[in-house]
């Protein structure tokens, strides 16, 4: 620490040498400290190690205006949840100018829960007043300490995260990119938020934190600082068919027994064909359409929803209202500063795009979760929790308790969707069959009934201005036990082929680990642990042409 008024500037070269700091750096930091306050102490050197402390302490007596002050330092007991917890760093000049609480060199929550709960985690500084003589020497306390205040310790936060589940999820996501979000449906407690790839938080608390941060920031391939579970905006694919089924039931354009004919796909206009999972002619009711993921069924249902109103604009806006009531298209309001709202198109969007000339079939990709629709993994996990609750959700949150304080009332209040509760049971029955006889039979768990839905999202990049297809993303949403849900999950694996290949098995392992505390299906666990998708992630950066996985599966996009 340095008090600028007490420093002999003629000794700056010797001071720099004794404290092992570059003279120009010393002069710059001393000027910053002086600009902040000439008589108040500011930090000169931060994060002094034990090895550095001894030689500095030995030389302090030679230089007035300097002293060593101990301070708390973050330690991390587990190598997990880096983006969730966030990191701290020194306040900048602008922050000091805006908030008189902070002084140059002090730390502030920069990201994650560290930022959201900064005022709880920092505590309150104490103040002690001293009297000085004309030689600027301390001669005692001021007014016998009547104006002194004691520091108030920071408050402990109890997180909703299940550490065992979080770390298990980390292991499953090795050599894969994407996220896992797990929520307790009845409470909105977020049980796990896994981001892959991630990083070691301890690398951002030592002297090299600036260098280490730059390395993370410059990793344009892995993007470890990008919190995919909260920031990743993706097409939800076939998982979105569930919401269109619910809206169809609510709007009375379908019921459980409504049959639709599928001839390997659907001609939604004269020359426009939406392919389905089979080339054979089939007839599906609602249950069958869910567990086989029939594109035709949901395309026809969506078209009838929009055309159930006097105009396409009115129908689309009503559809938009239904979708948003599940938390899509907004930030959800969780207690983390990072996030994206996703995107749910409105009639105004299409009016602007198509100059007021469009119909239901123009927007038919909405029926299968493609096109303009974007959702984040936490929104999809919250959607699964809402289905599990038969139509309502508690705003997801990461903090369960605050020491001697209360959490926000928003994390206790029910948010009710616009779908009547009676419509959820047939949907859930179809989602159970997804696991039992449908697109995710490889993810069954003995003695645990899972309700879920696989999804495959199209994946493209721009190469020299041209759109080039990459291997599709793998998605799964679900909850268990189906009759009394304790956990709702969304797993999103970038470039993971189809939903049943990676996302569904990982989800089932997460569910098994949480409900049974151990995993018995070692064959499946080993398959996931050994799975490596790094070759897929390198393809866009190859100078040669590359191929993608286009295997035709029962899981339609």
Regions found by a protein language model. Name each.
Residues 14-19, 31-154, 491:
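Small/polar-residue-rich segments within soluble enzyme cores
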Residues 133-138, 142-148, 186-239, 243-493, ...:
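Beta-lactam-recognizing serine transpeptidase/beta-lactamase-like catalytic domain environment
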Residues 552-557:
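Conserved small/polar residues in nucleotide/adenosyl-binding loops
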Residues 140-179:
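Conserved, well-ordered alpha-helix/loop/beta-strand core segments that scaffold catalytic motifs
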Residues 40, 64, 80-83, 153-157, ...:
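Envelope-exposed proteins and targeting segments
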Residues 407-415, 506-548:
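Short, gly/Ser/Thr-rich active-site loops of penicillin-recognizing serine hydrolases
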Residues 1-20:
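Juxtamembrane extramembrane loops of integral membrane proteins
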Residues 111-131, 177-202:
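Carboxylate/His-rich catalytic cores and anion/metal-binding grooves
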């Amino acid at each position: 620490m340095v008090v600028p008024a007490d420093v002999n500037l003629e000794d700056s070269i010797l001071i720099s040498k004794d404290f092992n700091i570059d003279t120009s750096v010393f002069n710059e930091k001393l000027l910053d400290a002086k600009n902040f306050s000439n008589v108040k102490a500011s930090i000169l050197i931060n994060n002094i190690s034990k090895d550095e402390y001894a030689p500095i302490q030995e030389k302090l007596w030679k230089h007035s205006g300097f002293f060593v002050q101990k301070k708390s330092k973050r330690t991390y007991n587990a190598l997990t949840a880096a983006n969730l917890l966030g990191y701290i760093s020194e306040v900048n000049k602008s922050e000091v100018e805006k908030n008189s609480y902070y002084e140059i060199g002090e730390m502030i929550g920069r990201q994650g829960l560290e930022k959201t709960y900064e005022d709880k985690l920092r505590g309150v500084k104490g103040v002690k007043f001293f009297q000085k003589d004309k030689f600027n020497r301390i001669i005692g306390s001021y007014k016998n300490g009547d104006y002194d205040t004691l520091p108030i310790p920071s408050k402990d936060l109890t997180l909703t995260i299940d550490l065992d589940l979080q770390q298990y999820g980390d292991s499953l996501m090795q050599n894969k990119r994407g996220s896992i979000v797990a929520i307790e449906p009845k409470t909105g407690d977020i049980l796990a938020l896994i981001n892959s790839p991630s990083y070691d938080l301890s690398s951002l608390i030592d002297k090299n934190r600036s260098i280490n941060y730059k390395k993370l920031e410059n990793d344009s391939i892995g993007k470890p600082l990008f919190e995919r579970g909260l920031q990743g905006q993706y097409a939800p694919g076939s998982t979105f068919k569930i919401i269109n089924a619910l809206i169809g039931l609510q709007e009375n354009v379908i019921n459980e027994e409504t049959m639709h004919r599928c001839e390997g796909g659907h001609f939604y206009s004269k020359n426009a064909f939406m392919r389905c999972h089979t080339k054979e002619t089939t007839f599906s009711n609602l249950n069958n359409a869910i567990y086989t993921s029939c594109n035709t069924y949901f395309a026809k249902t969506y078209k009838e929803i929009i055309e159930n109103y006097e105009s396409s604009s009115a129908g689309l806006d009503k559809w938009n209202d239904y979708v948003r009531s599940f938390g899509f298209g907004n930030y959800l309001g969780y207690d983390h500063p990072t996030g994206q709202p996703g995107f749910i198109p409105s009639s105004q969007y299409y009016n602007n795009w198509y100059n007021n000339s469009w119909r239901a079939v123009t927007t038919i990709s909405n029926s299968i979760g493609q096109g303009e629709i974007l959702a984040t993994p936490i929104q999809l996990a919250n959607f699964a929790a809402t289905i599990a609750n038969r139509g309502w959700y508690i705003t997801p949150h990461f903090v369960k308790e605050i020491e001697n304080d209360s959490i926000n009332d928003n994390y206790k209040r029910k948010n009710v969707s616009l779908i009547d509760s009676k419509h959820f049971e047939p949907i859930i029955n179809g989602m159970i069959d997804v696991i039992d006889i449908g697109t995710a039979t490889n993810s069954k768990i003995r003695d645990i009934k899972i309700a879920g839905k696989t999804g495959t999202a199209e994946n493209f990049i721009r190469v020299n201005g041209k759109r080039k297809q990459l291997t599709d993303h793998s998605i799964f949403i679900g909850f268990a036990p189906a009759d009394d849900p304790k956990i709702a999950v969304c797993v999103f694996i970038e470039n993971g082929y189809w939903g049943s290949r990676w996302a569904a098995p990982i989800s089932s392992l997460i569910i098994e680990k949480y409900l049974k505390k151990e995993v018995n299906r070692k064959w499946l666990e080993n398959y996931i642990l050994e799975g490596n998708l790094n070759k897929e992630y390198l393809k866009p950066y190859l100078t040669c042409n590359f191929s993608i996985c286009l295997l035709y599966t029962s899981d339609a996009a």
